[in-house]
Curated annotation (Swiss-Prot):
Protein name: Ribonuclease P protein component
Record organism: Corynebacterium efficiens (strain DSM 44549 / YS-314 / AJ 12310 / JCM 11189 / NBRC 100395)
E.C. code: 3.1.26.5
One Gene Ontology cellular component: ribonuclease P complex
GO molecular-function terms, A-Z: 3'-tRNA processing endoribonuclease activity; ribonuclease P activity; tRNA binding
Function of the protein: RNaseP catalyzes the removal of the 5'-leader sequence from pre-tRNA to produce the mature 5'-terminus. It can also cleave other RNA substrates such as 4.5S RNA. The protein component plays an auxiliary but essential role in vivo by binding to the 5'-leader sequence and broadening the substrate specificity of the ribozyme.
Protein backbone atom coordinates (compact mmCIF):
# COMPACT_ATOMS: atom_id res chain seq x y z
CA UNK A 1 0.00 0.00 0.00
CA UNK A 2 1.20 3.48 -0.81
CA UNK A 3 1.25 5.72 2.30
CA UNK A 4 -0.79 8.93 2.21
CA UNK A 5 2.33 11.12 2.36
CA UNK A 6 3.46 9.55 -0.94
CA UNK A 7 0.28 10.30 -2.90
CA UNK A 8 -0.58 13.16 -5.21
CA UNK A 9 -3.95 14.31 -3.96
CA UNK A 10 -5.16 17.21 -6.08
CA UNK A 11 -5.85 17.72 -9.75
CA UNK A 12 -3.55 20.75 -9.64
CA UNK A 13 -0.63 18.54 -8.60
CA UNK A 14 -1.40 16.09 -11.42
CA UNK A 15 -1.80 18.85 -14.00
CA UNK A 16 1.40 20.63 -12.97
CA UNK A 17 3.41 17.41 -13.01
CA UNK A 18 2.07 16.48 -16.44
CA UNK A 19 2.71 19.93 -17.93
CA UNK A 20 5.94 21.02 -16.26
CA UNK A 21 7.61 17.65 -15.75
CA UNK A 22 9.85 15.59 -17.98
CA UNK A 23 8.28 12.61 -19.72
CA UNK A 24 9.67 9.20 -20.61
CA UNK A 25 7.79 6.19 -21.93
CA UNK A 26 7.99 2.48 -22.48
CA UNK A 27 5.62 -0.15 -23.83
CA UNK A 28 3.65 -0.34 -20.57
CA UNK A 29 3.85 3.08 -18.87
CA UNK A 30 4.60 6.75 -19.42
CA UNK A 31 6.40 8.39 -16.49
CA UNK A 32 6.09 12.13 -15.83
CA UNK A 33 8.66 13.50 -13.34
CA UNK A 34 8.64 17.02 -11.87
CA UNK A 35 10.64 18.57 -9.05
CA UNK A 36 8.22 20.78 -7.12
CA UNK A 37 11.17 22.80 -5.83
CA UNK A 38 11.74 24.17 -9.35
CA UNK A 39 10.47 27.68 -9.72
CA UNK A 40 7.28 28.08 -11.68
CA UNK A 41 8.26 31.46 -13.11
CA UNK A 42 10.71 29.95 -15.60
CA UNK A 43 13.89 31.44 -14.14
CA UNK A 44 15.35 28.00 -13.52
CA UNK A 45 16.18 28.78 -9.90
CA UNK A 46 15.08 26.48 -7.13
CA UNK A 47 12.21 27.75 -5.04
CA UNK A 48 11.82 27.36 -1.31
CA UNK A 49 9.11 24.72 -1.12
CA UNK A 50 8.46 22.73 2.03
CA UNK A 51 7.57 19.14 1.24
CA UNK A 52 7.07 16.44 3.82
CA UNK A 53 7.02 12.71 3.24
CA UNK A 54 7.66 12.75 -0.51
CA UNK A 55 8.29 11.77 -3.21
CA UNK A 56 4.65 11.82 -4.29
CA UNK A 57 3.13 9.46 -6.85
CA UNK A 58 -0.05 9.58 -8.88
CA UNK A 59 -1.55 6.98 -11.20
CA UNK A 60 -3.63 7.24 -14.36
CA UNK A 61 -5.15 3.94 -15.47
CA UNK A 62 -7.66 4.38 -18.31
CA UNK A 63 -10.16 2.01 -19.88
CA UNK A 64 -7.59 1.28 -22.59
CA UNK A 65 -5.86 -0.99 -20.04
CA UNK A 66 -8.86 -3.32 -19.79
CA UNK A 67 -12.07 -3.92 -17.90
CA UNK A 68 -12.55 -2.84 -14.28
CA UNK A 69 -10.97 -5.98 -12.83
CA UNK A 70 -7.81 -5.59 -14.91
CA UNK A 71 -7.62 -1.83 -14.25
CA UNK A 72 -7.85 -2.34 -10.48
CA UNK A 73 -5.29 -5.16 -10.55
CA UNK A 74 -2.95 -2.95 -12.58
CA UNK A 75 -3.48 -0.05 -10.15
CA UNK A 76 -2.63 -2.29 -7.18
CA UNK A 77 0.54 -3.48 -8.89
CA UNK A 78 1.57 0.08 -9.76
CA UNK A 79 0.93 1.27 -6.18
CA UNK A 80 3.08 -1.58 -4.85
CA UNK A 81 5.90 -0.68 -7.25
CA UNK A 82 5.63 3.00 -6.26
CA UNK A 83 5.85 2.05 -2.58
CA UNK A 84 9.06 0.10 -3.29
CA UNK A 85 10.55 3.02 -5.20
CA UNK A 86 9.53 5.43 -2.40
CA UNK A 87 11.29 3.14 0.10
CA UNK A 88 14.45 3.63 -1.99
CA UNK A 89 13.75 7.36 -1.83
CA UNK A 90 17.05 8.63 -0.40
CA UNK A 91 19.02 7.28 -3.34
CA UNK A 92 16.39 7.66 -6.06
CA UNK A 93 14.10 10.63 -5.58
CA UNK A 94 14.01 13.63 -3.27
CA UNK A 95 10.94 14.51 -1.17
CA UNK A 96 10.14 17.37 -3.57
CA UNK A 97 9.66 15.12 -6.61
CA UNK A 98 6.23 14.40 -8.05
CA UNK A 99 5.77 11.39 -10.32
CA UNK A 100 2.70 10.64 -12.44
CA UNK A 101 2.53 7.17 -14.00
CA UNK A 102 0.14 6.72 -16.91
CA UNK A 103 -0.57 3.05 -17.62
CA UNK A 104 -0.73 2.11 -21.29
CA UNK A 105 -2.77 -0.71 -22.83
CA UNK A 106 0.10 -3.20 -22.46
CA UNK A 107 0.31 -2.74 -18.70
CA UNK A 108 -2.76 -4.89 -18.09
CA UNK A 109 -0.88 -8.02 -19.16
CA UNK A 110 2.51 -7.03 -17.71
CA UNK A 111 3.91 -8.59 -14.55
CA UNK A 112 4.88 -6.55 -11.50
CA UNK A 113 8.54 -7.06 -12.34
CA UNK A 114 8.00 -5.72 -15.86
CA UNK A 115 6.13 -2.70 -14.52
CA UNK A 116 8.86 -1.95 -11.97
CA UNK A 117 11.57 -2.30 -14.61
CA UNK A 118 9.71 0.04 -16.98
CA UNK A 119 9.03 2.64 -14.28
CA UNK A 120 12.65 2.67 -13.11
CA UNK A 121 13.76 2.90 -16.74
CA UNK A 122 11.34 5.79 -17.28
CA UNK A 123 12.71 7.61 -14.24
CA UNK A 124 16.25 7.16 -15.56
CA UNK A 125 15.23 8.44 -18.99
CA UNK A 126 13.56 11.43 -17.38
CA UNK A 127 17.04 12.28 -16.12
CA UNK A 128 16.68 12.03 -12.39
CA UNK A 129 17.52 8.52 -11.22
CA UNK A 130 21.06 7.16 -11.15
CA UNK A 131 21.64 4.21 -13.47
CA UNK A 132 23.16 1.83 -10.90
CA UNK A 133 19.79 0.18 -10.12
Amino acid sequence: MLPAQNKLTSSVQFRTTMRKGRRAGSSTVVVHLWDSAESLDGTGEKGEVASFGGPRFGLIVSKAVGNAVIRHRTSRRLRHVCARIAADSPELLTPTHHVVIRALAGSGQASSQDLERDIRHGLRKAGRVRTDK
